[in-house]
A protein has these predicted regions:
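Acidic, Ser/Thr/Pro
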Residues: 1-197
Length: 197
């Protein structure tokens, strides 16, 4: 996760884990790293106990927040500041996430892709890609194998926000799936959070 803050801001968010199947119960380490590379917070979240986390930003910029739920489901929410999910150059993994994810298409962009796939045998998702005006660009259900929405804009982007809606698939198992933004900044923002651009 990235979260943007000005020097002196008090940044807060909630963290929690939920058990998945027979994976072992485990605490979740959370680390916040400043733009300079300095670690400003290290905290451990007890298993299945929602925890409020906060820190004072020592400098202005984007802070990297890392959390590892192991094989279990984890969630960071209720952000006080603009944030985005990032795979730091890799795909972002979701588990049974239903909702909208917003992303920014920068000024001048003409071509980008949204690549998705399920994990393992038969795990998938239903996905709908929406234009900035809310019009549906494309939709696919029971997305198990790799699929890519390929977007070629008629005119270069003026800087716009697109959305990806994910929901339970019609016939595939509803568990793990991945999202990989191609040709644009790999930053996804869940609905309800302020967009980091």
């Amino acid at each position: 996760f990235f979260v943007y803050a000005e020097a002196g801001d008090e940044v807060s968010f909630a963290a929690e884990t939920q058990q998945v199947g027979n994976y072992a119960a485990a605490e979740m380490p959370v680390t916040v790293t400043a733009p300079s590379g300095e670690v400003v917070l290290e905290e451990t979240v007890p298993f299945e106990e929602p925890t409020q986390i906060s820190f004072t930003a020592p400098e202005t910029g984007a802070y990297l927040v890392t959390a590892d739920g192991g094989g279990n489901k984890m969630r960071l929410s209720d952000w006080s500041h603009p944030m985005a999910l990032t795979g730091a150059g890799n795909e972002v993994r979701f588990m049974q996430y239903a909702g909208e994810l917003s992303f920014y298409v920068p000024k001048g962009a003409t071509l980008f892709g949204v690549r998705m796939w399920g994990e393992g045998v038969g795990e998938g998702v239903k996905a709908t890609l929406m234009r900035p005006n809310g019009e549906v660009f494309g939709t696919t259900d029971n997305l198990v194998q790799t699929y890519q929405f390929e977007v070629e804009l008629a005119e270069p982007s003026e800087g716009e926000v697109w959305a990806l809606r994910t929901e339970q698939p019609g016939n595939a198992a509803w568990e793990d799936f991945y999202v990989d933004l191609r040709g644009i900044p790999p930053l996804l923002t869940p609905s309800g959070a302020r967009l980091l651009v």
